[in-house]
Curated annotation (Swiss-Prot):
The keyword Ion transport does not apply. K(+) binds at E43. Catalyzes the formation of S-adenosylmethionine (AdoMet) from methionine and ATP. The overall synthetic reaction is composed of two sequential steps, AdoMet formation and the subsequent tripolyphosphate hydrolysis which occurs prior to release of AdoMet from the enzyme. It catalyses: L-methionine + ATP + H2O = S-adenosyl-L-methionine + phosphate + diphosphate. It is found in: Cytoplasm. GO terms for biological process: one-carbon metabolic process; S-adenosylmethionine biosynthetic process. Its EC number is 2.5.1.6. Mg(2+) binds at D17. It comes from the Bacteria. This is S-adenosylmethionine synthase.
Amino acid sequence: MAKHLFTSESVSEGHPDKIADQISDAVLDAILEQDSHARVACETYVKTGMVMVGGEITTSAWVDIEEITRKTIRDIGYTNSDMGFDADSCAILNTIGKQSPDINQGVDRTSPEEQGAGDQGLMFGYACNETEVLMPAPITYSHRLVQRQAQVRKSGELNWLRPDAKSQVTFAYENGKPVGIDAVVLSTQHSEDISQKDLIEAVMETIIKPVLPAELITSATKFFINPTGRFVIGGPMGDCGLTGRKIIVDTYGGMARHGGGAFSGKDPSKVDRSAAYAARYVAKNIVAAGLADKCELQVSYAIGIAEPTSISVETFGTSKLEESRLIELIREHFDLRPYGLIKMLDLERPIYLPTAAYGHFGREEFPWERTDKAEALRAAAGL
């Protein structure tokens, strides 16, 4: 019986890199509300008392970058200078320019269907049947822990919690299937007035136990709650934050390969984002159709060219079909040209801020999580 361990991590919305991601996507959403065809590449840097928002944006819209930034920080929970970061008093620098006309001429076309990719690159999508949302178990439960941390912090149930937090979950696998949780790490920022003993007890009872299924916990499961013993200094005061620095947290927790491109702050003409969403959509429908237990799809593009330069699929020996037949089905049922995938998933809408914390995948509210192609794929496969 083959046994192994696999670990994934997540971070909360108050982590410095996630603050940056959320500001970038809040700016994107505000622009898309007014101009659905805008070209946006918005990058954010945060540090104690300061936010710098930059990038290249071409749009007919006007948005108040400063107010969007302050509201995003406020909604996360940084509302007091005692935390080292305050939405109402931090300095905000705006260094946004326009997208290069050299890129525009490659993307924009007289015929919308021939819209070129906004850049070259390779993207991966993945799905597996380990969880009900067809995501790997380690990243799924890592996200749920920090989501629960934010929930009890914002509700006031644990009013000594602060916005910054990190989680990590190690699963034990037998023959490729998750069978239990080997280790859990949860570090959460807190106020000065809570003892380590009380913190550990409250985090275990209020955050960990309600999230992790009891049947996956054993007497051998190890728990590490604030293992340094103190986490008062956090957020941008503890570390600087930058858009696009949590790409594994954003995707599959390391279980699948990654093409290297980040998501937040990018409009859907950027295939780094939109094609990664489409690849997840394809992989999830293949698994939902029962054509494979695991599916990893790679798609690649050349700047200014509509058709993907390659499509490849890996099912790790779990497919009921030849992988060449899977690729035929993908080409028949999914339009992976930039224009096609934008229309297929209705991406020219202000839907991106919620993606910027707790993972872009495995959350049913997003259009790329639909399994509406599964039945047609199954029928076409003759299963």
